[in-house]
Amino acid sequence: YIRIKKMHVKLPLYLGATLENMRKGAAIMGETSLPLGTKNSNCVIAAHRGYQGIPYFREIEKLKAGDKVTIQNPWEKLSYRVEKIKIIKPDDSDQIRIQKEKDMVTLLTCHPYRSHGKFRYVVYCIRDQGQKLPAQKIRTMNDTYFESSKWDIQREKIVRYAGLGILLFFGMELIKTSKRKGG
């Protein structure tokens, strides 16, 4: 599984980024490394930005340099720290290649939220060796400005709570009406 405390998620990991696997959790992309804690490796983990009410990587923009990501493989728990963040085009596979001498995990999801894949939000994590990482700005393609998905996510939460409130109100009214008719 993968655990990201800053995002409040713990997701099962599946091998292969198929639609079925990504509906169930996060997926290790094909032709990338497995999370075994070895140098010259990059395990690219993809997840939806949110799917059927389950957050998956919805809150990925909360991650900053130095934040912790934990991977539990069948043999051990591996700890990684966020090193840098980029926004890339979906077909820019050069951005997720193995980097010499590094043990990496790269998180990948669509950006902006609910965009259906216009861009990719990429979080590069390196094996935690106890070093402190400097804060970095999010790097983007050709200095293109990308709006944060924070407000879109907040709006979605408000709509959900408002809908719940309306349902509760009408449910209470229905109970009151049925009691008046019955009693």
Regions flagged by a language model, labelled:
Residues 1-158, 173-179:
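Solvent-exposed, non-transmembrane regions of membrane-associated and secreted proteins
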